[in-house]
Structure formats: structure tokens, C-alpha cells
């Protein structure tokens, strides 16, 4: 580290290396001596002209910081880069918290948490109380485990204890994502958070950097509009209001890829199709999830649908994000034709919690199926045929049934 003064400027030169990673900072700022002497004593303007280099890729930091005694700091900063990569930085952070005593402490903390969305306090209190803006313009940004995002643009506006991120946008695969984020009263015990946006025109295959994922296709569209408050992920989830919609088009998904979805996803997949483990691939025709949330209660009324080359699947029920309890009934229907009248899907339900999901028996489904079979015997099969026809009519187009107009989720999502 080198600091050298000259006139009203201080030149900074920093070079750091760790393993295969290197970090450098070079450039000039207003005299460090002047900053130390004048901060909160007299009006001060700090000019910043720095070049931050991470593994050979540079991020330019330009702008001014203003400090008037007894007033909040104000600033106007621009971050610009042709190509920057956060992969090693994020990986290094993960490694740092997975080593030695920190790892053991983190492990014990995780074991104690009974919620999928944990109760750890988010570091909102570390955000600065200030006035100003930060403009971000990065042509290509590398992130772990996915293709780089391109043309990243955003404007962050700070106003006391409120931060707005407006016109946040970037290219994703062959598509584009954009949205807005607002965080208010972040120094309080119940900060309020609102997010809205959408992403479209990309495929799952395009955004996965790992060719070993064995995924092809999967035209994807996402839209969301959510509001909540709280200082932890659990509080934010349990108080959430709004809507989320996701749709995925035709895709081929390796079983090994689906198994990375976590306990909840695996439990759903195994409940829908217990024989899937014998196949190394799922041929997806479409999947749609429309999830309205009211005070942390996710209601699913034929609003999650999946179609594969072999099955049509519909989900009904609720997920309570307050206690994270799951109460979902699964209705899978084979495409091979009529069954014997026993809707096996109606006998399956997802239960437990997001942290510890399990599949079980839908008692109401057992009774209904028994009644159907009994009536079928008495009517010579007419009741069974009627029940099958009804099931086919209501469950034969799960994706189309689940999908809502995109403009109902958030403006501009069409």
C-alpha cells in the first residue's frame, strides 16, 4: 500500500494477492490530510478518481463526496466497467465463512434455525444514512455458476434512511431483465421493502455456465411485485404481499440437475413421479407457477401446473410462510389415457415445512376415491367414466389454466 501526497491530492496504490487472486486499487483522491482535518469541521468536497482491478478486470470509480458539518454526507458517484468479474470475490467470501471457527459457528447457527427463511438479522444497519446517488454501468459482469450478465445499468438514490434502485436492468441470455427496489426506514426495527420487475426472452440453458448441468431449452419468463417489512428473511417472507409468476417452456432436464433443487423440490418431484429416479432425464413441455401472497400465505388454486411428455400435474393448497407449513395436494394425470377411476394423485399431499418437507396421504382423497369405486360398481362403471371425464376436463391443460396475464403481475411484463 502506497499513499503519496502532491498538492491537494493523494495518490493511492494498493496491490494485494491471495492464492490465484489479485486485487489492485490505483488513482487519486482529495488530500487525505485535508479530509482528516476538515471532516465535520468545515464544508468539504472529496473528489474520487480510482481504478479498482480484480484479477485483471477494472472497475472505474469516479465522483464527489460532500460533507457539511452536522449534516448527512451527500455524494454523486459513477461505477463503470467494460468487464468485471465477481466470481472469485463471492467464492472467497463463501470460503472465508466456511473455514475454522467461523464455519463451526455458522453451522451451529444453521442447525438451530427451524425456518428455511432464517431469522438472522439482515445487515440493514450497515447501510449509510446519506443523500446522493450512485450510477452503475457495467458492460459485462461475471457471477458464480452462471453465464455473465451484460449491459448492467442501475441508479441508486439515497435519501436519509431510504434507498431506491430505479431502472435496474441487464441482459440475461438472449433476453432482458429489469426492475425496481425500494428500502425504507432501514435503520428501524421494521424496514419496509418493495421489489417489482420481470425477466423474459432467455432460456435456462443460456444462463447456466456449467455444461455438465445437461439442460437444453427452457424458454423462461418471470414477473414479480412484492412488498414486505422486517429485519430478517423470515420476517420479510412472513409479512409478504404481492404476486409472483414463472413460466418455463419446452426443455430437457437431467435428473442430476433437478436433484440440486433442494429438499422441497425433490419431495415434490418424488411425490409426483416416484419412478423418476429410474430415468436420467425429464422432458418438460411447460411449467407455470402463479403465486399470490397475502400476509405470508401463498394460495395455490390450480395455479401451479406442469406438463411433461408423460404427465400433467396440478397443485392445490397453501404454503404458510409464517410457520412455513406446507399443505399442498398433488393431482398428476398420465397422458396414456383413462385410468381405472382411482385418481392416485388425489391421494398425495405435500406436508411438513419448507425446512423439512414430506409427502403423505390425503385422507379426503382416500374417501372420495372409495366412494367413486363403490358407485362405479353399482352403476356398472358409468360413475368411473364420468369422474375420469371430469378430471380430464379440469386438469388436462395445467399450464394454460395456471397462467395469468403478465400485466396483472407488474407493468411492462408483457
Where are these regions (language model features)?
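Solvent-exposed beta-strand/coil patches in large extracellular/periplasmic or lumenal scaffold regions
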Residues: 1-24, 28, 49, 101-198, ...
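Repeat-solenoid scaffold signature
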Residues: 42-76, 206, 210-241
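Terminal amphipathic helices with adjacent charged low-complexity linkers/tails
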Residues: 93-97
Amino acid at each position: 500500500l502506497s499513499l503519496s501526497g502532491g498538492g491537494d491530492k493523494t495518490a493511492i496504490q494498493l496491490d494485494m494477492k491471495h492464492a490465484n487472486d489479485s486485487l489492485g486499487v490505483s488513482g487519486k483522491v482529495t488530500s487525505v490530510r485535508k479530509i482528516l482535518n476538515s471532516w465535520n469541521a468545515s464544508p468539504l468536497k472529496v473528489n474520487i478518481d480510482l481504478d479498482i482491478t480484480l484479477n485483471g478486470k477494472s472497475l472505474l470509480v469516479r465522483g464527489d463526496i460532500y460533507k457539511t458539518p452536522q449534516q448527512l454526507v451527500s455524494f454523486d458517484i459513477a461505477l463503470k466497467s467494460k468487464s468485471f468479474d465477481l466470481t472469485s470475490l463471492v467464492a472467497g467470501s463463501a470460503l472465508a465463512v466456511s473455514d475454522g471457527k467461523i464455519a463451526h459457528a455458522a453451522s451451529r447457527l444453521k442447525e438451530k434455525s427451524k425456518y428455511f427463511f432464517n431469522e438472522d438479522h439482515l445487515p440493514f444497519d450497515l447501510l449509510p444514512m446519506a443523500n446522493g446517488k450512485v450510477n452503475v454501468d457495467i458492460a459485462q459482469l461475471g457471477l458464480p455458476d452462471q453465464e455473465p450478465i451484460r449491459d448492467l445499468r442501475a441508479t441508486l438514490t439515497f435519501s436519509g434512511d431510504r434507498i431506491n434502485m430505479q431502472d435496474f436492468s441487464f441482459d440475461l441470455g438472449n433476453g432482458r431483465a429489469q426492475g425496481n427496489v425500494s428500502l425504507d426506514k432501514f435503520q428501524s426495527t421494521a424496514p419496509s421493502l418493495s421489489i417489482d420487475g420481470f425477466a423474459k426472452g432467455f432460456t435456462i440453458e443460456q444462463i447456466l455456465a456449467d455444461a455438465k448441468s445437461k439442460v437444453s431449452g427452457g424458454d423462461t419468463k418471470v414477473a414479480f411485485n412484492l412488498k414486505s417489512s422486517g429485519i430478517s428473511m423470515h420476517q420479510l417472507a412472513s409479512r409478504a404481499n404481492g404476486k409472483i409468476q414463472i413460466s418455463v417452456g419446452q426443455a430437457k432436464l437431467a435428473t442430476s440437475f433437478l436433484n440440486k433443487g433442494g429438499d422441497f423440490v425433490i419431495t415434490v418431484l418424488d411425490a409426483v413421479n416416484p419412478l423418476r429416479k429410474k430415468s436420467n432425464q425429464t422432458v418438460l413441455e411447460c411449467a407455470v407457477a402463479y403465486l399470490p401472497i397475502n400476509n405470508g400465505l401463498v394460495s395455490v388454486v390450480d395455479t401451479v401446473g406442469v406438463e411433461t411428455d408423460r404427465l400433467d400435474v396440478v397443485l392445490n393448497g397453501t404454503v404458510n410462510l409464517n410457520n412455513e407449513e406446507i399443505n399442498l395436494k398433488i393431482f398428476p394425470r398420465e397422458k396414456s389415457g383413462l385410468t381405472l377411476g382411482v385418481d392416485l394423485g388425489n391421494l398425495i399431499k405435500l406436508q411438513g415445512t419448507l425446512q423439512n418437507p414430506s409427502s403423505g396421504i390425503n385422507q379426503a382423497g382416500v374417501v372420495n376415491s372409495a366412494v367413486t369405486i363403490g358407485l362405479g360398481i353399482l352403476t356398472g362403471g358409468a360413475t368411473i367414466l364420468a369422474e375420469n371425464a371430469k378430471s380430464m376436463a379440469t386438469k388436462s391443460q395445467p399450464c394454460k389454466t395456471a397462467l395469468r396475464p403478465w400485466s396483472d403481475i407488474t407493468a411492462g411484463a408483457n
